[in-house]
């Protein structure tokens, strides 16, 4: 008896099933950052100025622009006396000092997990440590963390960078990482650092955030069960890009979309089962719109996979909490 290895009827006609990763989408840091901007607009009125995109998502940024947020990169573009919000990615000491010198009313939407890294850098620097930062050059979080010091912090993006690195204090050396990296890539680079600098001090807890870890773990479960993976996220979103790369590394074709309009029917030719996830800065509204588009392409079943339930919630800054907003329309 021979086994029939020809494509199934379902595979021939395209999408039939959609499997949703759990968890996916907004994390606590993104929720908090968006809420800070929205509350600032309600309390102080538009415009509210935000340094850099509050989170890396086109829909979120455009929605906040419509509500009265103005996104800037240079503090010189902020008028005197304005209210300024720092993005979730964090800022350097120089930016913080400039904002104070200009007299802005500042609300800090830096993710508390990024702030934790900044605090650790400041603490160990006082103890004479230099730092290796594992991250992506040019990412605002990396610029913010490296900008906590004027010197003594070195960026490595891959294992080759580690081999070429020269430090001043190999006996007083600590590692920090960008919070949105691939956990596998970060582990590989950290291992190379430890081989090169055996006395290096590792973070007390892994810097890569719980939400990044959970979403990557979910894709590791999702990808082998489907024919193609779709990641909802903007091109500038580091954690969304890592989800797409992870699925591809596991052998499953993967695509990243900013919205449902980016979907292409040809991606799903011969692919009955589609896995769907979203980066930590992508709202669930966009996921629902992608699901509807996949239904239009033939999907008849949409089901959630089992996954970690996230209950983390970060407090808002003083002045924007619930009590301070009483009576604000």
UniProtKB/Swiss-Prot annotation:
**UniProt cofactor note:** Binds 1 [4Fe-4S] cluster per subunit.
Q: Does the keyword Transmembrane apply?
A: no
Q: Which reaction does it catalyse?
A: isopentenyl diphosphate + 2 oxidized [2Fe-2S]-[ferredoxin] + H2O = (2E)-4-hydroxy-3-methylbut-2-enyl diphosphate + 2 reduced [2Fe-2S]-[ferredoxin] + 2 H(+); dimethylallyl diphosphate + 2 oxidized [2Fe-2S]-[ferredoxin] + H2O = (2E)-4-hydroxy-3-methylbut-2-enyl diphosphate + 2 reduced [2Fe-2S]-[ferredoxin] + 2 H(+)
**Enzyme Commission code(s) on record:** 1.17.7.4
Q: Indicate the enzyme's highest-level EC class.
A: oxidoreductase
Reported cofactor(s): [4Fe-4S] cluster
Pathway assigned in UniProt: Isoprenoid biosynthesis; dimethylallyl diphosphate biosynthesis; dimethylallyl diphosphate from (2E)-4-hydroxy-3-methylbutenyl diphosphate: step 1/1; Isoprenoid biosynthesis; isopentenyl diphosphate biosynthesis via DXP pathway; isopentenyl diphosphate from 1-deoxy-D-xylulose 5-phosphate: step 6/6
Question: What positions does UniProt annotate as the active site of this protein?
Answer: 141
Q: Where does (2E)-4-hydroxy-3-methylbut-2-enyl diphosphate bind?
A: 56, 89, 139, 179, 237-239, 281
Tell me the residue numbers annotated for binding isopentenyl diphosphate. 56, 89, 139, 237-239, 281
Matches recorded under Gene3D superfamilies: 3.40.50.11270, 4-hydroxy-3-methylbut-2-enyl diphosphate reductase, catalytic domain (3.40.1010.20)
Which residues are noted in the entry as dimethylallyl diphosphate-binding? 56, 89, 139, 237-239, 281
Q: What Pfam families does the annotation carry?
A: LYTB
Which NCBIfam families does the entry mention? ispH_lytB (TIGR00216), PRK01045.1-2 (NF002188), PRK01045.1-4 (NF002190)
HAMAP family noted in UniProt: IspH (MF_00191)
- What function does this protein fulfil? Catalyzes the conversion of 1-hydroxy-2-methyl-2-(E)-butenyl 4-diphosphate (HMBPP) into a mixture of isopentenyl diphosphate (IPP) and dimethylallyl diphosphate (DMAPP). Acts in the terminal step of the DOXP/MEP pathway for isoprenoid precursor biosynthesis.
Name of the protein? 4-hydroxy-3-methylbut-2-enyl diphosphate reductase
Origin organism is Methylibium petroleiphilum (strain ATCC BAA-1232 / LMG 22953 / PM1)
Q: What is the lineage of its organism?
A: Bacteria, Pseudomonadati, Pseudomonadota, Betaproteobacteria, Burkholderiales
């Amino acid at each position: 008896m021979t086994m029939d290895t020809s494509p199934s009827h379902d595979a021939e006609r395209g999408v039939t099933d959609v499997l949703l990763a759990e968890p996916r989408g907004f994390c606590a840091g993104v929720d908090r950052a968006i809420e800070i901007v929205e509350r600032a607009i309600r309390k102080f009125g538009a415009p509210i100025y935000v340094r850099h995109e509050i989170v890396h998502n086109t829909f979120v940024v455009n929605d906040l622009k419509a509500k009265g947020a103005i996104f800037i990169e240079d503090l010189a573009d902020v008028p005197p006396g304005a209210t300024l919000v720092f993005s979730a990615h964090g800022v350097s000491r120089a930016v913080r000092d400039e904002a104070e010198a200009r007299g802005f009313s500042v609300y800090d939407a830096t993710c508390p997990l990024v702030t934790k890294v900044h605090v650790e850098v400041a603490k160990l620097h006082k103890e004479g440590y230099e730092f290796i930062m594992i991250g992506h050059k040019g990412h605002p979080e990396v610029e913010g963390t490296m900008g906590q010091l004027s010197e003594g912090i070195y960026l490595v993006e891959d294992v080759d960078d580690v081999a070429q690195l020269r430090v001043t204090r190999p006996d007083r050396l600590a590692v920090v990482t960008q919070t949105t990296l691939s956990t596998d890539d970060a582990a590989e680079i950290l291992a190379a650092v430890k081989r090169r600098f055996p006395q290096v001090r590792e973070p007390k807890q892994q810097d890569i955030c719980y939400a990044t870890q959970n979403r990557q773990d979910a894709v590791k479960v999702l990808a082998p069960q489907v024919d193609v993976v779709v990641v909802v996220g903007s091109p500038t979103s580091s954690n969304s890009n890592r989800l797409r790369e992870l699925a591809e590394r596991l052998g499953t074709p993967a695509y990243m979309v900013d919205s449902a309009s980016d979907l292409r029917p040809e991606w799903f030719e011969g692919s009955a089962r589609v896995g769907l996830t979203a980066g930590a800065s992508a709202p669930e509204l966009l996921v629902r719109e992608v699901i509807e588009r996949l239904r239009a392409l033939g999907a008849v079943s949409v089901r959630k996979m089992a996954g970690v339930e996230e209950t983390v919630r970060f407090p808002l800054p003083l002045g924007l909490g619930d009590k301070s907003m009483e009576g604000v329309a």
